């Protein structure tokens, strides 16, 4: 499809549902969970008042939402060529020409600029971490690694793990071991989560010539990599031992449960897609449960 044809079919206003697809609202919401947990933990561990910290939390969440949504919109702009090839992406407004390139870029950069303004209003570290997340996701992941190396998921995991750091520094202004621990949890979680998704869409990525690990190295190699990242998750709850024995035990059981799920089905010649789906669903629940546990346990300690 040439440019004239694309513009001629770009008609009407983008609906709210389509806007959510453009900025990948599901992905953004998932990242707001560790961002809030980072802020909450900073309040508890540095003895800040929750009520007096509410403005910072809200500004952090708004700023984080905007920079993540803007970066995702820019990713959708850059990925239009491969999205048109992949069957699962055919419903995207960028594929159906529901938004022009000009409006898409204006939306993307507008959101990122306003989001960065919000974060810099909080403090310089928040704004700098926001910039690191944007550059890492757009440049190093979307533009470079996604199309050139099977390490793309790991590269993308770094900017994807920045939200809890932003949450922490929004309150405290500097990083701590607890903040780094939250970063590492999200960093190690992402390859497992996205490899599971990539297994389910392996044929699509191969069709679009995207070097995702399952498409290039195969299913068995990808499962081994997922186990490595699962093992790396195991010691991380101990970095948050200040939250108490109860937290460490429950978080460790959460990790062991994920490992057991993967190992049990790994030993069987089960359907690859079914196995990947089980791991993917667990990953979604894991993220919510782990960070909810961080908030609840720290709340109990504060009371």
Curated annotation (Swiss-Prot):
Chief location bin: membrane
Note from the entry: Carbon 2 of the heme B porphyrin ring is defined according to the Fischer nomenclature.
Record carries keyword Acetylation: no
Catalytic activity from the UniProt record: heme b + (2E,6E)-farnesyl diphosphate + H2O = Fe(II)-heme o + diphosphate
Matches recorded under Pfam families: UbiA
Gene that this polypeptide is encoded by: ctaB
Summary of subunit composition and partner proteins: Interacts with CtaA.
Keywords: Cell membrane, Heme biosynthesis, Membrane, Transferase, Transmembrane, Transmembrane helix
The protein's Enzyme Commission number: 2.5.1.141
Involved pathway(s): Porphyrin-containing compound metabolism; heme O biosynthesis; heme O from protoheme: step 1/1
GO MF annotations, alphabetized: protoheme IX farnesyltransferase activity
GO biological process: heme O biosynthetic process
Membrane topology: Multi-pass membrane protein
Gene Ontology cellular component list: plasma membrane
Protein name, UniProt field: Protoheme IX farnesyltransferase
PANTHER family: PROTOHEME IX FARNESYLTRANSFERASE, MITOCHONDRIAL (PTHR43448:SF2)
Entry's family note: Belongs to the UbiA prenyltransferase family. Protoheme IX farnesyltransferase subfamily.
InterPro entries to which the protein is assigned, alphabetical: Protohaem_IX_farnesylTrfase, UbiA_prenyltransferase, UbiA_sf
Record field: transmembrane: 25-45, 54-74, 118-138, 166-186, 230-250, 280-300
